[in-house]
Amino acid sequence: LGRIHTSDQAYAAIDFARQAGFDSFNLDLMHGLPAQTLLSAKTDLFAAIACKPSHLSWYQLTIEPNTVFHKRPPLLPVEDELADIQQCGEQLLADNGYSQYEVSAYSQEGFNCRHNSNYWSFGDYLGIGAGAHGKISFPDGRIKRYNKRRQPQEYMSVTSQPFVASTRTLHRDEIAGEFMMNALRLNDGFTLPQFASRTGLDYAQLEPQLELLCQRELLVRDRNAVRATGTGRRFLDSIIAEFFPD
C-alpha cells in the first residue's frame, strides 16, 4: 500500500503508547485490499484485536484521485467477496466485545470516540496543523469548510500568507445532503430537531425523501429519529444522493 511504516513499527508504537500511560488508543485497519481473501482479511483483523485497542477503525480501501492506485488500478476483491469480508469482520468484532457505532468505527464499552461522534453528527471542529480540515457554522446560517496547507514544510514556512489553503462556503441547497452524508453513517442516525439545529434548515423539507426511502426500506423512522436500515447501510451513496440537488 506504500505506507511509510512497517508492521513491526506499528506494534512498537502500540507498546510505546502503553508504556507512556495511555489506557485508550485506536488502531486503523483497512480491508478490501488488492488480492485480499476472506481468510487474509480475518487474519489481519485477528491481529488488530489481539492488540486490545479500546477503539478500532476498520474500513474498506477506497481508490482516491491523484494516487498510484488511481493511475494503475490494482485487482480488488469483487462485491460478493467484500460483502463476505464485511459480514464476517463485523461478527468477529462483536464476538470480541467491540460495538459498532458508525460505518467503520468500533469500540469497547465506554470508548466511543467523541471527535468521531461530533464529526459524523455534523458538528463543528477546528483543523490544526498541516493538511488539517475544519468546519465552522456561523450565527447567520453560513457553514464553511477549510483546509490548511498540506505540506508540513510549506505550512511551517508561511509568514506573510495565511496557513489556510482554501475555504468553501456550503450552498444552502447542498447543506441537507452534506448533513446526511455524515449523520447516516452513525448506527443511531439522527433526530429531526438535531438536523434543524445543525443545518439551520426546516426539517419539513426532508419529508418527501424520507417517505420514499422508508417505503423502500432503506431508512427507518421512529417519530423524530431517522437511521439507515441494514440494507440502507449498504447503499448509503444512493440514499445520500436523494438529498442533493439534481
State what each model feature region is.
Residues T231-D246:
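Short, amphipathic alpha-helical interaction segments positioned at domain boundaries
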Residues P74, N118-Y119, L206-L210, R221-D222:
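Alpha-helix boundary/capping detector
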Residues L1-L201:
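C-terminal scaffold of the Radical SAM
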Residues C214-N224:
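A short, conserved structural fragment
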Residues Y119-F122, L212-L213, A241-F243:
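Short, charged low-complexity intrinsically disordered segments located at boundaries
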Residues A225-G230:
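Minor-groove-contacting beta-hairpin "wing" of winged helix-turn-helix DNA-binding domains
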